[in-house]
Every structure is written in C-alpha cells, then in structure tokens.
C-alpha cells in the first residue's frame, strides 16, 4: 500500500527538468502563465553561454513586446536550478529558495529546456 501511494504521489509532482543545453542561440516560445502555460506562437531568442542567459525579441514576435524592436534584450541573468527542480533566470543566489517564481508572480522567470518555452505573464 505504501509503495502504491508513493508511486501515485510521484506521478503528480512536476518532474525535474533536464540539464542546460549547450552554449548557443535558440528560438523558444513564450508560455503564458495567465493562460495555463499555453503558447500562442510568440517567439523569443534564447542565448546561452556558460550558465548565462540572454532573452531577446525575435523578428517573429507578436505584439507582446510592444515598443520593442527585434533584437532588443528582454531579460538576462544566471541560470539556476530552483528548489522545485525547474530552471530559472536569476540575478540573486537566494532565488533558488523563493516560494513564488515564474509567470505573474514577480519572481524569477522560469525556462523549460525540454519544452523550449519561457514562462511569462
């Protein structure tokens, strides 16, 4: 019985993400937190170099970045693994212990390397 409960509980938890991809430039989609993480085709340029990340406006971006031009920096920081197992864009080592992250919380941005998404509000 205890084994069965452990198995059921483990499937309900969000699984930790894979490791950071190699240095390079990638195109990710925006996952909108206020719409349950749905993507709407809005692209972001993701530049990774030695644990540092820079997000830039893609030329294929929608109206999300009103007033921003293609190539403008949206956000940058250090990649850190949050205590929950997800990767965050952080500028403070203490961010890994924050209760609220990502989306519309005002906390660090969540990046999902497996789904190739950036969670934003």
Question: What residue ranges belong to the model's regions?
Answer:
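Positively charged, low-complexity intrinsically disordered regions
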Residues: 3, 16, 81-84
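Acidic/polar residues at beta-strand termini and the immediately following turn/coil
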Residues: 111-113
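Tryptophan-anchored aromatic micro-motifs
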Residues: 9, 13-40, 115-119
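Sec-dependent signal peptide recognition
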Residues: 1-7
């Amino acid at each position: 019985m205890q084994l069965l409960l452990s198995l059921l509980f483990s499937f309900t938890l969000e699984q930790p993400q894979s490791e950071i991809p190699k240095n390079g430039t990638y195109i990710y989609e925006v996952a909108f937190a206020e719409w349950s993480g749905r993507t709407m085709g809005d692209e972001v340029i993701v530049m990774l170099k030695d644990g540092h990340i820079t997000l830039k406006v893609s030329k294929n971006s929608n109206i999300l970045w009103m007033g921003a031009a293609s190539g403008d920096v949206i956000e940058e920081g250090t990649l850190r693994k949050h205590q929950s197992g997800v990767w965050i864009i952080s500028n403070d080592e203490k961010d890994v212990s924050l209760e609220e992250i990502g989306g519309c919380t005002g906390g660090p941005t969540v990046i999902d390397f497996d789904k190739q998404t950036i969670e934003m509000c």
